[in-house]
Amino acid sequence: NSDISVSQLKGPQRPIVSENQRGEVLAALTCVDYVVVFSEPDPLRVITAVQPDVLVKSTDWDPKEIIGREVVEARGGSVLSVPEVTGISTTILIERMRTAL
């Protein structure tokens, strides 16, 4: 998500980490071929345009409700649900900073 869409979804104090920084972290992963920043409320347009082989979402999403699932699976791609890393999130980092002050 773009910085603008993160602000719309999470509030005016977000994001903490810029879209460029988030993109750099993702692009550094060897399993990532391409990073796209989007401002729409959901990624369907980007998924349709890029036609990824793999779409990954966290397990907090119902697999049937993953946006773009049909697009990816229709061309033989995979949709994966992976658990979030416990204890690591922007919300947790913000709370730690608040309690440290």
Where are these regions (language model features)?
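Nucleotidyltransferase catalytic core that binds NTPs
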Residues: 1-101
